[in-house]
Amino acid sequence: MNIRPLHDRVVVRRMEEERLSAGGIVIPDSATEKPIQGEIIAVGHGKILDNGSVRALDVKVGDSVLFGKYSGTEVKLDGKEFLVMREEDIMAVVEG
């Protein structure tokens, strides 16, 4: 897949949701919430500042991130679902 987000946008693949309860019961799609954690797949060149300079993004490809429940725009590419969002919609980078 070749996608290059513009400016301060990033492409995120959601982490797989847990489909099995602690007791071993399979949870249907309709009963699970979409995860708010994902992996950065692609990043733009950076945020264009008021003075015209470009600030590089703090996140990079491969980072595991947390984002808001309603962040980003869902897109489907090559049969897979991704989110395109601005860097400011990312709340944290998960390390370790």
From Swiss-Prot:
Keywords: Chaperone, Cytoplasm. Its main location: cytoplasm. It holds the Pfam family Cpn10. Signal peptide: none annotated. GO terms for molecular function: ATP binding; metal ion binding; protein folding chaperone; protein-folding chaperone binding; unfolded protein binding. Heptamer of 7 subunits arranged in a ring. Interacts with the chaperonin GroEL. This is Co-chaperonin GroES. It comes from Allochromatium vinosum (Chromatium vinosum). The gene is groES.
